[in-house]
Amino acid sequence: MGPRLSVWLLLLPAALLLHEEHSRAAAKGGCAGSGCGKCDCHGVKGQKGERGLPGLQGVIGFPGMQGPEGPQGPPGQKGDTGEPGLPGTKGTRGPPGASGYPGNPGLPGIPGQDGPPGPPGIPGCNGTKGERGPLGPPGLPGFAGNPGPPGLPGMKGDPGEILGHVPGMLLKGERGFPGIPGTPGPPGLPGLQGPVGPPGFTGPPGPPGPPGPPGEKGQMGLSFQGPKGDKGDQGVSGPPGVPGQAQVQEKGDFATKGEKGQKGEPGFQGMPGVGEKGEPGKPGPRGKPGKDGDKGEKGSPGFPGEPGYPGLIGRQGPQGEKGEAGPPGPPGIVIGTGPLGEKGERGYPGTPGPRGEPGPKGFPGLPGQPGPPGLPVPGQAGAPGFPGERGEKGDRGFPGTSLPGPSGRDGLPGPPGSPGPPGQPGYTNGIVECQPGPPGDQGPPGIPGQPGFIGEIGEKGQKGESCLICDIDGYRGPPGPQGPPGEIGFPGQPGAKGDRGLPGRDGVAGVPGPQGTPGLIGQPGAKGEPGEFYFDLRLKGDKGDPGFPGQPGMPGRAGSPGRDGHPGLPGPKGSPGSVGLKGERGPPGGVGFPGSRGDTGPPGPPGYGPAGPIGDKGQAGFPGGPGSPGLPGPKGEPGKIVPLPGPPGAEGLPGSPGFPGPQGDRGFPGTPGRPGLPGEKGAVGQPGIGFPGPPGPKGVDGLPGDMGPPGTPGRPGFNGLPGNPGVQGQKGEPGVGLPGLKGLPGLPGIPGTPGEKGSIGVPGVPGEHGAIGPPGLQGIRGEPGPPGLPGSVGSPGVPGIGPPGARGPPGGQGPPGLSGPPGIKGEKGFPGFPGLDMPGPKGDKGAQGLPGITGQSGLPGLPGQQGAPGIPGFPGSKGEMGVMGTPGQPGSPGPVGAPGLPGEKGDHGFPGSSGPRGDPGLKGDKGDVGLPGKPGSMDKVDMGSMKGQKGDQGEKGQIGPIGEKGSRGDPGTPGVPGKDGQAGQPGQPGPKGDPGISGTPGAPGLPGPKGSVGGMGLPGTPGEKGVPGIPGPQGSPGLPGDKGAKGEKGQAGPPGIGIPGLRGEKGDQGIAGFPGSPGEKGEKGSIGIPGMPGSPGLKGSPGSVGYPGSPGLPGEKGDKGLPGLDGIPGVKGEAGLPGTPGPTGPAGQKGEPGSDGIPGSAGEKGEPGLPGRGFPGFPGAKGDKGSKGEVGFPGLAGSPGIPGSKGEQGFMGPPGPQGQPGLPGSPGHATEGPKGDRGPQGQPGLPGLPGPMGPPGLPGIDGVKGDKGNPGWPGAPGVPGPKGDPGFQGMPGIGGSPGITGSKGDMGPPGVPGFQGPKGLPGLQGIKGDQGDQGVPGAKGLPGPPGPPGPYDIIKGEPGLPGPEGPPGLKGLQGLPGPKGQQGVTGLVGIPGPPGIPGFDGAPGQKGEMGPAGPTGPRGFPGPPGPDGLPGSMGPPGTPSVDHGFLVTRHSQTIDDPQCPSGTKILYHGYSLLYVQGNERAHGQDLGTAGSCLRKFSTMPFLFCNINNVCNFASRNDYSYWLSTPEPMPMSMAPITGENIRPFISRCAVCEAPAMVMAVHSQTIQIPPCPSGWSSLWIGYSFVMHTSAGAEGSGQALASPGSCLEEFRSAPFIECHGRGTCNYYANAYSFWLATIERSEMFKKPTPSTLKAGELRTHVSRCQVCMRRT
């Protein structure tokens, strides 16, 4: 299949989709012709609108049809071998080939979409689980989706997890830049001796030597060649030579680097190389033709036919409404980019930016200088190397010492000398036989003859004797036997012929002649016998030849690395390589550094071609910045009120009740009716009178409450400083490669950095008007730079991205354009940015265009702009109850609720040891209700003035018939309050009273934790009546409303406590009430801009107990409180010696809270406390003498008694519970301590208030007009200007503030009580509040401790009647020590007592004077090691660790970024990836690790590659699964695409913790506590595993924080596909740890089915804990 055909096939589905969209749009269009009876609304055509936002990128157009093949040309001459050609055109169809092998079965298709939900069934009973049914038939596979466009390249990833230091040996770093040349290192160790060099070339022959002494004339011998002798043994080393003269050279200077050497000889053949895998071979020959295939399936519908001839022009129809925005048009013809502007001047340096992310990997640096020499470490022995070349001859050695060697063997006989001159005539003495004369003198040496040929090597001689003392030269031996004749010599020079003399005898050996010059190098002699071995250390033999390679030795110890060699000289430039094939496309590069901003370019050439049609009015532009404030205008005219008749109003409120009618006759009693439906909950009745019952038993811990709504977002942070500009990289080499095939148009790339300014090119031919490109990415806003020098006037630049600037000047009139055909209806565009409140300036009127040709009727237009809001209607009547909807999105935070119920009272703790007397505390809260007192006795009571005791309650009588209503009597005067009777039974509920005056709303409570969205529950039965809440603080009286209808009878409230008050007088007529009932709850508004911090509110009611906060800083010292209870007197210690007071030092740093001190002695009597708050009671009569009471609280301590005698030492008591941290003590006397370490950096302070305005500056010189600046921030609102013209219809505004609170709904069923939270750490001490109003009288409290003596002006009661004499009381407890007595007389000196227990150490004395230095003692022996010291005091806080490396990931399961838990540090935010599925196999992420938090979201975040160097993206039926949010599914259940996916994907945060983090699971509905020494990070539900498509999935490690999700959902994740869609599917299951009762552990689990609303009752709870550091 050729490349063109494959493009056709790829684009065919896109064409069909477009065709389908077109037909759908046409069907929707409705009335588009002239038959619509609409009125003619043609008004005056408005002015030309602002330029709209750029449209979306168009789709890829259809490919053109393939042209016909041309005729075949004549063959040309044979040309040179050309470059490899482009792929040829598609050949003609060959004969059918043989049928191929059957293919592998295809991958399974994507599951089809779920059907719409059926009608709801009747809820059935919970049936038991049925048996597994037979497998159903497999469903039909769905259609495969279209491949999505390739995604944009991802940003460069962040550095990986820090898991501690990696040793440098394991990971090799990138090569660095060249270092500075190092200083020369010390001289290295001498190298090993090199091998012997090769023998030198043979030298030239030396000059002839002086003539030798004449030899004897030899016999003329025969010459024949003797046999070749054996090689002799190597001879003994010769005697040492004469010592040479040593010359000393001075040490040279540093060598300079030599010139480049000549090219060396070619090296030995290298080891075989390891090659890379070769490129794929050329295509093979075409295969055999295949057989005919089966008949093809029915083809796809054809392309639309050619358009028909145009119809007749119809009558002009009415103007249609503005249609929806059309789909993106096809890409326009791109006109070349304009020339780049000149490079701008270098700007002033910016302020240093914050520390950026780690930059991309740098380029390798130049090689550094050689390092210092390493220590030698022996390496392992290598394999034997190849034999090296023979070395050069070594230098001459030092002279050896001379020892005489043994005499050598006789040399070969020399050549015969010339014949000597004739001798003197002999002396005959007349005798014929002459006597031999004396030997003659040695003749002069003859002329040397020509050298003879070198003789053959003689036979091996006998081994010589070793000569021990060889001083005497031996005599010459006798002549040897005659040798064989030598070869014929060259003829000698002819001598003068003499007379032949008689041969003389041998002469005496002459003196040795001088040393001759060296002769020619002889042939090597035969190997001699081994000589005697004589060894002298000073003699050094000649270096032998290199041996053969030995066997590899044992590996040696590792040597230290050698010094680096000096850098080599640069080699010659290599020859250019062959042209390579084009490589695979590389991965996308990292994002480059942003370039500096270029200058504004010159204006482009004028456009070319006729002008286009006048476009629709554009969207309203971005509002301009606010203008400078105008002066306040004059007061306007009063507006005219045009009444508009509204729709009929809702039914009015009932009128006031009429006067009461006359009393009717009494009717007969009716038959009792059926019980009615449970009525609505009545209002809380008046509190009854009676004592409260005893407190009930402590309830079971309830479930934790839902999390409250999120708080208001914080103020936006400040912008960071700009980063430093990066280093510009080096220019790369130009690449070489063949041109590739033309690719499909790619998606728009990320805008590149601006290039440097090029030279201005020649203006090109004007191009056609291009389509508007896609909007660029929004850049990051930089900090404002320092003011630049005034530049020259720049030409207008391209429109920038960002807030709009001020309105530009009107443009010139363009040439008229042809009118284009109407476009297709587009998809709905993205919502625009919300505009500011002010309308923009009115635009200039555009020039009149030429009339265009009448176009065909267009598709329906965009919807019109939103009209102004109508006059609000009256509230409608209440509608029927609608179908239960799906859970809505979480609402904005509601008004703060009333304070919750008070928690259960805790058990009493053990009494702690009494501490020292503290400063008076603030006034405490109201105490708990006390237990009811014992019943009082009524003896000796004056019955005349007292109300009698109430009798026992009689049996309840039958309910009589209702009597007639009596007329109302006058109110009686209030009686004297009677004595309290015993508590009566609660009375029957009274009728519901008139509603009281509504109080002011209570102070807002703290926001509760955010609740998770519950599933849709079945309607529950009406809940029981809730417990009445605590009365709120008394509100200021409201204005009286109209009298309401009589309420239903309420249930009896709890009996109230208090004295009945007097009846008040009738109040005055109130003023009219505020406007009527609030309207319905408004839509959720957008989050407004955070306001300035408000003034502190009133003191709120107590909130519920929060999670434990970190301990606050100690508050300031409070006002003096009421006196505390005194401690038990301590045991008196021995008195220490008084120290002399030291000088007062500066106040030291605040210490840690100390442990409890030893109880002090009893304090002095305190001052009388403030009078208690309350009404004075009536004086009671004297009561009977009570029975002996329980031991009371200790009374106030008296003055210190006389010291008692010292008691025996008691046993150590059990340690008391840890007390609260004490208040800071008063400053002690201390010497100046050392300066402490710097504390950790504090939290950043609030931004300061703006400073005062500075004085006005000097007027500056008028600058040249600058370039257009970036839009500024919105200015402050100006003074109101004069009334402007009416503005255009604005963009939809930001959502309004929340409406007036709606009417109070019915009280919901009571929630499950939450667990009692752990006791919080003490908070910061608050500011003392204002004095509150008089509260409702509280319940009677527990008997308090004895109060301080009251003021003396209380009226003393009348004395009671004397009681009868009582029996003597029991012996009282030992009294407290009495008040201090008078000073006694000094007693006699007592007998000395036994020695006491040693006292505590006294205070340290002052430092003594320095004594004189003693003599130095002898050095002692070393002592034994001492015992371990005590643990030191806690050190200052350490510096924050950088390499904690404990990472924990937290998932919000909402669209908000989660906060890192307290004590951890944020690293980054991302999207919560649960697992991926590729090729039908799933791989999951641990939700507690950083791998589950991807920085970027994609429905297909991975691609797959094969062994053929091919990777595919979004081309297969793969899935990704992400944690989801509570966003409900759309009602259509259609897959979610595009930006609509964003609200469904959970966000996450990767945090760095200072210690290990783990999860603990309770397997109950209780939240498990963290182990000892661990603190809580968050609580949640125990999430174990999950499955989805193909029953594949993954799971969580239960020790990982990922197994503890903070919110429980039955479907906690969403499935996404490569085609860009996400949805929830019925085959997705989540698995959670269940709750297990201890008694059910080993029993068979009971099957059960839980419906919505009860799901959390069986899911285990968990907590994520971090080890405390």
Curated annotation (Swiss-Prot):
The modification 4-hydroxyproline is found at residues 603, 606, 623, 626, 629, 632. Residues 48-459, 504-1382, 1404-1431 are annotated as: Disordered. One of its GO terms (cellular component) is basement membrane. GO terms for biological process: basement membrane organization; blood vessel morphogenesis; brain development; branching involved in blood vessel morphogenesis; cellular response to amino acid stimulus; collagen-activated tyrosine kinase receptor signaling pathway; epithelial cell differentiation; neuromuscular junction development. The modification 3-hydroxyproline is found at residues 204, 207, 210, 587, 602, 605, 647, 1214, 1424. Residues 586-595, 621-630, 797-817, 1011-1020, 1290-1299 have a biased composition (Gly residues). There is a cross-link at residue 1651 (S-Lysyl-methionine sulfilimine (Lys-Met) (interchain with M-1533)). InterPro entries: Collagen (IPR008160), Collagen_IV_NC (IPR001442), Collagen_IV_NC_sf (IPR036954), Collagen_superfamily (IPR050149), CTDL_fold (IPR016187). It is linked to Hereditary angiopathy with nephropathy aneurysms and muscle cramps: The clinical renal manifestations include hematuria and bilateral large cysts. Histologic analysis revealed complex basement membrane defects in kidney and skin. The systemic angiopathy appears to affect both small vessels and large arteries. Alpha chains of type IV collagen have a non-collagenous domain (NC1) at their C-terminus, frequent interruptions of the G-X-Y repeats in the long central triple-helical domain (which may cause flexibility in the triple helix), and a short N-terminal triple-helical 7S domain. NC1 domain mediates hexamerization of alpha chains of type IV collagen. There are six type IV collagen isoforms, alpha 1(IV)-alpha 6(IV), each of which can form a triple helix structure with 2 other chains to generate type IV collagen network. Interacts with EFEMP2. This is Collagen alpha-1(IV) chain.
